[in-house]
């Protein structure tokens, strides 16, 4: 899906790592929440509350998921899942565009 309709966009940006990772939150009529963001090159670690589906819309990133000791490359068109209440690491070598979906379990 290349666009979302009938959503509320939160004006204030989510800014992480001194502005190297930014996103905007959108909320659907049913309460579902997603963020649309950009990551500049760098090494990052994020923690999750909810389960997350990370869809790569542009660029690529190397991802180390919980329970793994190696990085796997995800590129445009790929999606990876991150368990709730966990941490994952990223190595971004080029600007990456992403959509993160938060999944209530």
Curated annotation (Swiss-Prot):
Disulfide bonds: none annotated. It catalyses: a purine D-ribonucleoside + phosphate = a purine nucleobase + alpha-D-ribose 1-phosphate; adenosine + phosphate = alpha-D-ribose 1-phosphate + adenine; cytidine + phosphate = cytosine + alpha-D-ribose 1-phosphate; guanosine + phosphate = alpha-D-ribose 1-phosphate + guanine. Its EC number is 2.4.2.1, 2.4.2.2. Gene3D superfamilies: Jelly Rolls (2.60.120.10). It holds the Pfam family Ppnp. Transmembrane segments: none annotated. InterPro entries: Ppnp, RmlC-like_jellyroll, RmlC_Cupin_sf. It is an enzyme of class 2 (transferase). One of its GO terms (cellular component) is cytosol. Keywords: Glycosyltransferase, Transferase. GO terms for molecular function: guanosine phosphorylase activity; purine-nucleoside phosphorylase activity; thymidine phosphorylase activity; uridine phosphorylase activity. It comes from the Bacteria. Catalyzes the phosphorolysis of diverse nucleosides, yielding D-ribose 1-phosphate and the respective free bases. Can use uridine, adenosine, guanosine, cytidine, thymidine, inosine and xanthosine as substrates. Also catalyzes the reverse reactions. Belongs to the nucleoside phosphorylase PpnP family. PANTHER family: PYRIMIDINE/PURINE NUCLEOSIDE PHOSPHORYLASE (PTHR36540), PYRIMIDINE_PURINE NUCLEOSIDE PHOSPHORYLASE (PTHR36540:SF1). This is Pyrimidine/purine nucleoside phosphorylase. It comes from Clostridium beijerinckii (strain ATCC 51743 / NCIMB 8052) (Clostridium acetobutylicum).
């Amino acid at each position: 899906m290349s666009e979302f309709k009938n959503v509320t966009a939160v004006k204030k940006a989510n800014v992480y790592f001194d502005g190297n990772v930014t996103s905007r939150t959108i909320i659907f009529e049913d309460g579902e929440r997603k963020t649309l963001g950009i990551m500049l090159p760098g090494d990052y670690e994020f923690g999750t509350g909810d389960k997350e589906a990370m869809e790569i819309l542009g660029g690529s990133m190397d991802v180390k998921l919980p329970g793994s000791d190696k990085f796997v490359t995800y590129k445009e068109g790929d999606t990876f899942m991150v368990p709730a209440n966990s941490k994952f690491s990223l190595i971004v070598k080029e600007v990456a565009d992403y959509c993160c979906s938060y999944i209530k379990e």
